Amino acid sequence: MPIITISRGSYSRGKEVAERLARELGHQCISREIILEASEQFNIPEIQLVHAIEDAPSFLDRVTRGKERYVAYVRAALLRRVQVGDVVYHGFAGHLLLRDVPSALKVRILARIEDRIQEVVKRDRVSEDEARERIAKADDERRKWSHHLYRVDPGDVSLYDIVLRIGPMTLDDAVGAIALAARLPAFQTTPEVRKTLAELADRADAEARS
């Protein structure tokens, strides 16, 4: 079975899709655990990694390439973790960190802005205007981050194998569609893929420590 990445905008219910999908397939479901693993592997304070991957790049980041260093730690930890296969990863930028991994199934989950606003209102008990501002800020930071490090927009559908919109489609519908795709030969973790994964992980580890 494959390695699956779930990318989503904030408050788009991608976490729920990932967790249900992992249960359906019998996969590991991982997210922020990778930050902790990177922190332990490279002896970097966890809070520094969190800021590096969640905050939009500052002027200093653009000059010193500070974010690149922290992202290298996370990428190395993630590549090491997914070598076992049978993983659903819904954390930070999986579709980008694993873009060189053959056969990884990259999924994008979308939701209508009205549904996202109501999700924030319900979860955080704020007004609709405040919810809209929070979503806009989060989306803007993700766009800036992706462009700074990879020169891509997370909304570019060419980055993904599957793009699904929650709303017209239920969570169970989305899980079913992804599970069906996950069984296709193109997305299986073959011995050749495992060899490539090991090589990528070794290279990423060396780059992170350099």
Language-model-detected regions and their locations in the chain:
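N-terminal targeting leaders
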Residues: L180-S210
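Glycine-rich phosphate-binding P-loop
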Residues: T5-L21
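Conserved nucleotide-binding/hydrolysis micro-motifs of P-loop NTPases
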Residues: G94-H95, A111-I117, P168-T170
